[in-house]
C-alpha cells in the first residue's frame, strides 16, 4: 500500500518519542501490505477497528497510540487522517 501523509506521523513521533518504534513498524507493515478488503486488514492487525467510509483505527504499542486512516483499496492508498496518544 502507498502510505499518504507521512509528515504528520513524523511530527507525532517528534512530539511523542516513545511512539517511534511502534509508528515506524506500523508504517513498514502498511507499505508492504496489499489490502483488497477490510478483512485483509483484520487478518494482519486483529485489533484494528473497521469503521464506516473506509476508515480504520489501528491501535499501536498496546493501545497507547492510535492511528486513524482512510483506505482506498482499489488504488492501494492509505491516507492518515488522525493520530492520538491515549
Locate each region found by the language model:
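Conserved small/polar residues in nucleotide/adenosyl-binding loops
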Residues: 84-86
Amino acid at each position: 500500500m502507498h502510505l499518504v501523509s507521512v509528515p504528520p506521523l513524523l511530527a507525532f513521533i517528534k512530539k511523542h518519542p516513545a511512539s517511534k518504534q511502534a509508528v515506524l513498524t506500523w508504517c513498514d507493515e502498511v507499505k508492504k501490505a496489499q489490502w483488497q478488503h477490510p478483512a485483509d486488514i483484520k487478518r494482519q492487525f486483529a485489533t484494528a477497528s473497521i469503521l464506516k467510509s473506509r476508515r480504520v483505527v489501528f491501535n499501536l504499542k498496546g493501545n497507547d497510540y492510535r492511528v486513524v486512516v482512510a483506505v482506498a483499496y482499489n488504488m492501494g492508498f492509505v491516507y492518515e487522517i488522525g493520530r492520538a496518544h491515549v
